[in-house]
C-alpha cells in the first residue's frame, strides 16, 4: 500500500484557550522526580466552560500543539510482570487497559505523536475492533490472534499488521523470552501503510477546570480491571499520574515512568466471549465500549464523576459530568481503564 496518511473529514480536538494553571500539591513515589511538567493551558473564566472546535495544529489525542501528520497506530501490549519493562509505551498518546481472559489485562496503546519501537506486542481480541472503531481506518498492530478474531478483524475497517502473518516491521528481542519478545517498529509500519490520521474521539482538553477547586482529593487511584489491580499515584512534579504495581512505579526500559496527566476509569459492561478459549480452557472477555455508563476522571490530584456515551461503532465517546457539561482532560494524553460497573474506585 502507498506511504502516507489519509485525510480525515472529522476535525482534530476540542480545546480551550490558555490563561492560568493552578499550583498543585506534591506527591512523590519511588524516588522518581522531574522538574519539568507537560504543556498546559487554562480556560478563560470559571463561568465559561465552552468547548470549542480546535484549530488545525492541536493533537486531539493529547490536546497539545502540533498536529501529527502520520497515521494513528494502535498496538496491543502485554500488561503482566513477564512483559515488563515495556519498550516505547511512554511515547503513547492514549493507553487503554482492558480485561482479557482469566482476570488478566492487556493494553491498547495509541500512537500518533511518535513512532517508537514497541514491546511486548501481544494478540488481538474482538473487543479491540469495537473500541478502535471510533478512531476510523487506523492501523492495529498485534502479534496474532484466534482465527475467529482475525476473521472479524479482516472484515473490519482497521488495517491489521500481524506478526504471525509475517507482515511489516516486526522482530524478536533476543534478550527477552517468548512470547514477550515481539517488537514492532512503528516507523516502518507508518511508512508502509496508508491509514487515517488523528480525529476527534471525544476528549475535551483544557489546562484548568474550575470544578477542580471543589472536587475530592485523589492523590492515588486504586481500581481493578478484571481481577488485576490497577493503581496510579499523582506526582505533582511531573504533573502526571504514574502507574504503579504494589505501590512502586512502573518504568519502561528507558527508565521513564508510565505516566499521563489523566486517568479515566470507564465502567463498561463486560461479557464472556465463548468463541475464543485460551490454552487453559478460559474464555476471553468482551468489553462493550459502545453504549453508556459511568466514569471517574482523575486529574490534578482530584476526581470528578460523570458519564460516558457512544451511540455507534464509528462515533466518538462523549464524556460529561453529572450536570451534563463536558469533562475536561489536562493536555498530555490519558490512561483509560475499562472496568466492570460497580468496581470500587
Regions found by a protein language model. Name each.
Residues 2-37:
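Secretory targeting and sorting signals
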Residues 42-43, 48-94, 101-111, 115-345:
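A surface/extracellular/periplasmic glyco- and lipid-processing/surface-interacting theme
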Amino acid at each position: 500500500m502507498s506511504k502516507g496518511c489519509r485525510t480525515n473529514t472529522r476535525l482534530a480536538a476540542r480545546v480551550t484557550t490558555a490563561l492560568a494553571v493552578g499550583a498543585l500539591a506534591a506527591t512523590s513515589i519511588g524516588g522518581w522526580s522531574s522538574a519539568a511538567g507537560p504543556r498546559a493551558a487554562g480556560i478563560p473564566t470559571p463561568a465559561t466552560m465552552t468547548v470549542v472546535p480546535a484549530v488545525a495544529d492541536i493533537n486531539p489525542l493529547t490536546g497539545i500543539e502540533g498536529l501529527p501528520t502520520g497515521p494513528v497506530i494502535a498496538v496491543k501490549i502485554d500488561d503482566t510482570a513477564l512483559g515488563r519493562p515495556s519498550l516505547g509505551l511512554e511515547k503513547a498518546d492514549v493507553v487503554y487497559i482492558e480485561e482479557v481472559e482469566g482476570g488478566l489485562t492487556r493494553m491498547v496503546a495509541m500512537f500518533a505523536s511518535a513512532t517508537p519501537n514497541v514491546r511486548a506486542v501481544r494478540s488481538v481480541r474482538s473487543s479491540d475492533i469495537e473500541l478502535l472503531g471510533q478512531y476510523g481506518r487506523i492501523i492495529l498492530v498485534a502479534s496474532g490472534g484466534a482465527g475467529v478474531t482475525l476473521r472479524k478483524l479482516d472484515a473490519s475497517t482497521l488495517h491489521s499488521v500481524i506478526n504471525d502473518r509475517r507482515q511489516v516491521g516486526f522482530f524478536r528481542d533476543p534478550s527477552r523470552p517468548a512470547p514477550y519478545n515481539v517488537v514492532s517498529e512503528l516507523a516502518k509500519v507508518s511508512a508502509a501503510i496508508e491509514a487515517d490520521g488523528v480525529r476527534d474521539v471525544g476528549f475535551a482538553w483544557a489546562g484548568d477546570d474550575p470544578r477542580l477547586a471543589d472536587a475530592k482529593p485523589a492523590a492515588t487511584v486504586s481500581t481493578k480491571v478484571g481481577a488485576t489491580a490497577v493503581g496510579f499515584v499523582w506526582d505533582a512534579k511531573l504533573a502526571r499520574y504514574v502507574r504503579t504495581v504494589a505501590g512502586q512505579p512502573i518504568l519502561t526500559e528507558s527508565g521513564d515512568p508510565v505516566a499521563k496527566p489523566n486517568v479515566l476509569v470507564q465502567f463498561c459492561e463486560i461479557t464472556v466471549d465463548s468463541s475464543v478459549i485460551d490454552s487453559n480452557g478460559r474464555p476471553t472477555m468482551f468489553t462493550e465500549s459502545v453504549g453508556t455508563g459511568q466514569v471517574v476522571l482523575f486529574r490534578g490530584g482530584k476526581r470528578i464523576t460523570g458519564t460516558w456515551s457512544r451511540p455507534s461503532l464509528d462515533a466518538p465517546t462523549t464524556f460529561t459530568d453529572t450536570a451534563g457539561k463536558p469533562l475536561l482532560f489536562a493536555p498530555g494524553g490519558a490512561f483509560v481503564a475499562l472496568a466492570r460497573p460497580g468496581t470500587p474506585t
